[in-house]
């Protein structure tokens, strides 16, 4: 009950909570091994995106957030790569886990995403790769770190950078330009393998800066 109450409070404040050591340390090597087994089905990409996953607008200034495109690199392993008996699938579909998430999010129910590709994914960042600043199109995301990088790759977010009523382009421009006001709004999470993160990213800009060029894959 204390864990759920703390998660609810943190989500209400800035849309992010972390449950430390959610996955047992003794389970992590097996999960990491499973990722290695299905890694040949990794889909990698290298594109430039703005925070809104939209096209630019020539009627706006060149440094407007809509016209600010930054490299997004990395890859993902889609759900159809997993074996039906996968340990990841077992956790993902566990009714107790779904009930726990709904309690933390303070919603009546949470259901598994039915998309055969995006329902359950492994996100992979190799040396020198990054996820650029962006807003999510979904209401929330649930992520668990399996393998961390030795350098870089820490999750950064700017809580409530926009709202359902206003885009706050000026505020996002501060973040993108790394100006003092923007930097002051950014929080950094140092996640460790086994940590579970619940994040409401629709209105909170976030990114994963570059993984160190000599680091292992995150």
Per-region residue spans from a language model:
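Short, solvent-exposed loop/turn segments at secondary-structure junctions
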Residues: 23-25, 147-149, 162, 203-205
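Short, well-ordered beta-strand elements within core beta-sheets of diverse protein domains
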Residues: 17-21
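Non-heme Fe(II)-dependent double-stranded beta-helix
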Residues: 1-2, 12, 22-96
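Non-heme Fe(II)/2-oxoglutarate
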Residues: 156, 160, 210-218
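Short beta-strand His + acidic residue motifs that chelate non-heme Fe in jelly-roll/DSBH
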Residues: 131, 205-212
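Catalytic core of non-heme Fe(II) oxygenases with the double-stranded beta-helix
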Residues: 81-89, 98-196
């Amino acid at each position: 009950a204390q864990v759920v109450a703390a998660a609810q409070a943190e989500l209400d404040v800035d849309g992010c909570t972390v449950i430390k050591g959610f996955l047992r340390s003794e389970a992590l090597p097996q999960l990491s091994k499973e990722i290695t087994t299905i890694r040949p089905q990794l889909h990698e990409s290298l594109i430039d995106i703005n925070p809104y996953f939209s096209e630019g607008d020539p009627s706006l200034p060149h440094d407007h957030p809509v016209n600010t495109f930054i490299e997004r690199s990395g890859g993902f392993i889609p759900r159809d790569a997993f074996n039906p008996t996968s340990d990841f699938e077992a956790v993902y579909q566990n009714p107790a886990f779904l009930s726990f998430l709904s309690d933390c999010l303070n919603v009546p129910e949470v259901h598994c995403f039915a998309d055969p590709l995006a329902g359950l994914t492994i996100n992979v960042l190799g040396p020198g790769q990054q996820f650029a600043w962006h807003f999510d199109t979904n209401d929330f995301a649930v992520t668990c770190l399996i393998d961390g990088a030795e350098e870089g790759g820490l999750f950064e977010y700017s809580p409530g950078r926009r709202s359902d009523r206003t885009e706050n382009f000026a505020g996002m421009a501060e973040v993108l330009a790394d100006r003092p006001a923007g930097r002051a709004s950014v929080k950094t999470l140092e996640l460790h393998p086994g940590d579970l993160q619940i994040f409401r990213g629709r209105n909170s800009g976030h990114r994963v800066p570059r993984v160190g060029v000599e680091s292992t894959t995150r």
